Amino acid sequence: MVIKEDCINNLARWQADEEAHSCFQCKTNFSFLVRRHHCRCCGRIFCSSCTENFVNYNKKRVHALQKKNSDVESPPYRTCNECYDNLLHLNLLVSSTNRDVRLSQTSVPPNALALSAPDSNTDEDAEILEDSVDQSGTACRSEESSQNEEDHFCPICNSDLTQFPDEEETRKHVEDCIQRAENAQQHTNTSDAADDSVKESPAFQNRMLVYKISPNTTDNAIKECPICFENMEPGEKVGRLECLCVFHYKCIKNWFHKRAQMTAAQKGNGHAFVKRNFCPFHDAVF
């Protein structure tokens, strides 16, 4: 198998069965009933419960490990829980059609259906077309503006990148965060001190599941964002922390940003981050 140099798991290896007597994550001893299962991302051996994710990898950044001299395995690949969380956070999981799993399919505006009608050359239909184009253009500009705002933050640790003096410092910060995330992804720790350093880093701790609420969500299932107290409507982008609290994505991002500013001011420096699993709701309660 040819391994690309830019794959985040190019240092991972397929662990031999005889090396593992218990699950790498939950430490359950293997037996006749508790079988060994390899994670195709990190190569470690886990029990079935800790490798219950079957996903497709971004082949440009992640290569699927397999046993030496074995037949080529087809996706989806069995993946341990930790690798799944990290790959999802790094946008390295794709659907069977090779699309980012976080991206929802683009919906066609209802008015656009009228454009395919045989007798759609009337003035009324022309007005419908114009309105539809205007609405689409406004939506696109809104999405572009939102994307530009997100580009101001580090995709790994959520630090405000506008705080850095130049592009070189910004690039160095992002590369450092990516390297820390890769080390955590590959379970590579050289010492106890390094282990503590990785666990304390924002790249290791900042984990948030970002997704859009399903359009099929019923009214009874719609919940209120604890930050803005507005309903999280179907189709809206939300973020779920490790405590399972869910917020509007923009609300939780703004909270992280403000919290980081407060932390930086208290520490007397310009660089700070807030853990994405440090919930603003629990912060207020406790």
From Swiss-Prot:
Membrane topology: Peripheral membrane protein
Gene Ontology terms, MF aspect: phosphatidylinositol-3-phosphate binding; ubiquitin-protein transferase activity; zinc ion binding
Keyword Oxidoreductase: no
Binding site for Zn(2+) 1: 23, 26, 47, 50
One Gene Ontology term, aspect cellular component: endosome membrane
Compartment list: Endosome membrane; Vacuole membrane
Primary location recorded for the protein, binned into one broad class: membrane
GO term, biological process aspect, one: regulation of protein catabolic process
Catalyses which reaction(s): S-ubiquitinyl-[E2 ubiquitin-conjugating enzyme]-L-cysteine + [acceptor protein]-L-lysine = [E2 ubiquitin-conjugating enzyme]-L-cysteine + N(6)-ubiquitinyl-[acceptor protein]-L-lysine
Binding-site list for Zn(2+) 2: 39, 42, 80, 83
Pfam family, one: FYVE
Pathway: Protein modification; protein ubiquitination
ZnF (FYVE-type) ranges: 17-88
Matching Gene3D superfamilies: Zinc/RING finger domain, C3HC4 (zinc finger)
Broadest EC class assigned to this enzyme: transferase
Keywords tagged on the record: Endosome, Membrane, Metal-binding, Transferase, Ubl conjugation pathway, Vacuole, Zinc, Zinc-finger
InterPro entries: Znf_FYVE, Znf_FYVE-rel, Znf_FYVE_PHD, Znf_RING, Znf_RING/FYVE/PHD
Zinc finger extent (RING-type): 225-283
Note: Present with 195 molecules/cell in log phase SD medium.
Function: Functions as an E3 ubiquitin-protein ligase. Binds phospholipid vesicles containing phosphatidylinositol 3-phosphate.
Protein name: E3 ubiquitin-protein ligase PIB1
Organism this protein belongs to: Saccharomyces cerevisiae (strain ATCC 204508 / S288c) (Baker's yeast)
